[in-house]
Amino acid sequence: MLAPKRVKFRKRQRGRLKGKDERGSYVAFGEFGLKAISSGRITARQIEAARITINRQVKRGGKLWIRIFPHLPITKKPAETRMGKGKGNPEFWIAEIRPGRVLFEMAGVDEETARKALHLAAFKLPVETSFVKRNVL
């Protein structure tokens, strides 16, 4: 699963997701992509589940790029613990997604296969997505 090797701070504040994503909003590496059209938080496990689903569909053909990385820690206190006594320990890692962000990209497969694979991967993710193609000028 994806997780950062080192971080500057072990714990972070929650914050909130506002606005659209300008960076990473177009298909840069592959021919087809899966683009977020709603905001949310995607865990490393959800990214891995989507990756496995895509790879099962394309088998040995094609190349996959994961354009998001879970670099933000989510903390959790142990079960049946009283309130207070500080913030809990980091439990898992998330990526914050804003509308417009390209999550996955594919190349080396036909459009029908890519559309099917990315559609199945979208079921594994907690954000609404759409299928996009690379803009060739």
Curated annotation (Swiss-Prot):
GO terms for molecular function: rRNA binding; structural constituent of ribosome; tRNA binding. Belongs to the universal ribosomal protein uL16 family. The gene is rplP. Keywords: Ribonucleoprotein, Ribosomal protein, RNA-binding, rRNA-binding, tRNA-binding. One of its GO terms (cellular component) is cytosolic large ribosomal subunit. Part of the 50S ribosomal subunit. This is Large ribosomal subunit protein uL16. The keyword Methyltransferase does not apply. It comes from Leptospira biflexa serovar Patoc (strain Patoc 1 / ATCC 23582 / Paris). The keyword Repeat does not apply. Binds 23S rRNA and is also seen to make contacts with the A and possibly P site tRNAs. Pfam families: Ribosomal_L16. One of its GO terms (biological process) is translation. It comes from the Bacteria. The lineage of its organism: Bacteria, Pseudomonadati, Spirochaetota, Spirochaetia, Leptospirales.
